[in-house]
Amino acid sequence: MTYKRVLLKLSGEALMGDKPYGIDPAIVQSIAEDVEKVIANNVQLAIVVGGGNIFRGLKGSADGMDRATADYVGMLATVMNAISLQDGLERVGVETRVQTAIEMQEIAEPYIRRRAMRHLEKGRVVVFGGGCGNPFFTTDTTAALRAAEINAEVVMKATKVDGVYDRDPNKFNEAKKYSSLSYQQVLSDEIAVMDSTAIALCKDNNIPIMVFDIFKKGNISRAVAGESIGSLIS
């Protein structure tokens, strides 16, 4: 089954590639080329991007910053990533709009739900930056929120691992990968795939979550085509 309207969640760390910080142009190029194939198949795609490659609000708070202030800095980091993604997408011919939850009209449109949906219907990619505009909410929660707002059929969480495991596969060789699991299992077992607010939002709105490896070339288009390449939460 090919999905028709998809919300893709990209972590900021995914944009780093092998770099310790910032944005790897080669990764942006690879993502853009994969997205171009998705759009060519008449799939409507919106993207929520994180900011952890530049600044992470929770870490800033742990280091002594006021939590709300740290979160706002993190929101600005997501806008930097959103604009960089827009540049990469437009260089491969994909018409793209950036919408931000915090107004900065010189560089992006303000987030307006109806306008975002019109862009999608016209075959444009919409990249949502600035989180949801409020501190104390993660970009995973933003992804769940925007998916519900634009009536997306699925949230696709593109990450550094190839699915959901019962423990950290980088630390435990015996870690077990789930091909599928329920929202309730994620919540009750406290599986660290997305925060509980994001999972609950998807559960309440019956939006499945596909978790897959972003670094394998072509995985975005495979996931959109409905291939079983990661873990499905539903």
Curated annotation (Swiss-Prot):
<protein>
    <recommendedName>
        <fullName>Uridylate kinase</fullName>
        <ecNumber>2.7.4.22</ecNumber>
    </recommendedName>
</protein>
<feature type="binding site">
    <location>
        <position position="165"/>
    </location>
    <ligand>
        <name>ATP</name>
    </ligand>
</feature>
<keyword id="KW-0665">Pyrimidine biosynthesis</keyword>
<keyword id="KW-0067">ATP-binding</keyword>
<keyword id="KW-0418">Kinase</keyword>
<comment type="pathway">
    <text>Pyrimidine metabolism; CTP biosynthesis via de novo pathway; UDP from UMP (UMPK route): step 1/1.</text>
</comment>
<dbReference type="InterPro" id="IPR015963">
    <property type="entry name" value="Uridylate_kinase_bac"/>
</dbReference>
<dbReference type="InterPro" id="IPR036393">
    <property type="entry name" value="AceGlu_kinase-like_sf"/>
</dbReference>
<feature type="binding site">
    <location>
        <position position="168"/>
    </location>
    <ligand>
        <name>ATP</name>
    </ligand>
</feature>
<dbReference type="GO" id="GO:0005524">
    <property type="term" value="F:ATP binding"/>
</dbReference>
<dbReference type="Pfam" id="PF00696">
    <property type="entry name" value="AA_kinase"/>
</dbReference>
<dbReference type="GO" id="GO:0044210">
    <property type="term" value="P:'de novo' CTP biosynthetic process"/>
</dbReference>
<keyword id="KW-0963">Cytoplasm</keyword>
<dbReference type="GO" id="GO:0006225">
    <property type="term" value="P:UDP biosynthetic process"/>
</dbReference>
<feature type="binding site">
    <location>
        <position position="52"/>
    </location>
    <ligand>
        <name>ATP</name>
    </ligand>
</feature>
<feature type="binding site">
    <location>
        <position position="51"/>
    </location>
    <ligand>
        <name>UMP</name>
    </ligand>
</feature>
<comment type="subunit">
    <text>Homohexamer.</text>
</comment>
<comment type="function">
    <text>Catalyzes the reversible phosphorylation of UMP to UDP.</text>
</comment>
<feature type="binding site">
    <location>
        <begin position="132"/>
        <end position="139"/>
    </location>
    <ligand>
        <name>UMP</name>
    </ligand>
</feature>
<dbReference type="InterPro" id="IPR001048">
    <property type="entry name" value="Asp/Glu/Uridylate_kinase"/>
</dbReference>
<dbReference type="GO" id="GO:0005737">
    <property type="term" value="C:cytoplasm"/>
</dbReference>
<dbReference type="GO" id="GO:0033862">
    <property type="term" value="F:UMP kinase activity"/>
</dbReference>
<feature type="binding site">
    <location>
        <begin position="9"/>
        <end position="12"/>
    </location>
    <ligand>
        <name>ATP</name>
    </ligand>
</feature>
<feature type="binding site">
    <location>
        <position position="159"/>
    </location>
    <ligand>
        <name>ATP</name>
    </ligand>
</feature>
<dbReference type="InterPro" id="IPR011817">
    <property type="entry name" value="Uridylate_kinase"/>
</dbReference>
<feature type="binding site">
    <location>
        <position position="71"/>
    </location>
    <ligand>
        <name>UMP</name>
    </ligand>
</feature>
<comment type="similarity">
    <text>Belongs to the UMP kinase family.</text>
</comment>
<keyword id="KW-0547">Nucleotide-binding</keyword>
<keyword id="KW-0808">Transferase</keyword>
<feature type="binding site">
    <location>
        <position position="56"/>
    </location>
    <ligand>
        <name>ATP</name>
    </ligand>
</feature>
